Amino acid sequence: VLAAAASTLKRVTLELGGNDAGIVMDDVDVEAVAPQIFDGAFGNNGQICIAMKRVYAHESIYDKLVDQLAELAKEAAVGNGLEQGTKLGPLQNKMQFDKVKGYIEEGRADGTIVAGGEVPDGKGYFIPPTIVKDIDDESRLVKEEQFGPVLPVIKYDDIDDVIERANDTDYGLGGSVWSSDTDRAYEVAKKVDSGTIWVNKHADVQPHIPFGGIKTSGIGAELGEEGLAEFTARKVINVAKA
């Protein structure tokens, strides 16, 4: 789209992919935030540009958070969205279905799968929500955008180090910071290189708030006054004084 627009200098806005990191600090109430983190990662079975693609959890709450996320994953019914009780539907197409299965195998090789990981037999591109622990930043599952129901949970012990790790990506669409101390979380959020950083929530997009990515996650903004301004051009009328 950008290349096609270049020849005639058309202005464009681009909202592209992301590898959103969730940074979970050491003072969180794990039982309170785990369902929100799960929903932030697995909404539409992970097929949302601003879904949480990787979680960094402080070592002091790491095991508890992994256990909570694993339980939520095991409880989430996957199937036909028209059927009562279904929480998560299928992958959108076979290409993405096969791609996500590949990421599951990456997770199996590089970490430990604690929930999901097995693709059911039968028709449909159904993959259960999969939680992977004991994995590091060099795995493809962490470095790339999986766009599907596979969530790596990575351990950290130093906040400055994890900010650097979260920023070590070509993407910059969204991200979130989770803490019982919002002032502390805000200071962390200021250092994360993304177009939007949520505190104690994720993927909360509102029509009056501008949204857009940085780095390879996009150009310009949509929504809000800034989004409307993308479709306007500044005009100056300069009149000589008598």
Where are these regions (language model features)?
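Conserved C-terminal structural/oligomerization subdomain of aldehyde/semialdehyde dehydrogenase
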Residues: 23, 77-78, 104, 119, ...
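ALDH superfamily catalytic-core signature
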Residues: 1-136, 199
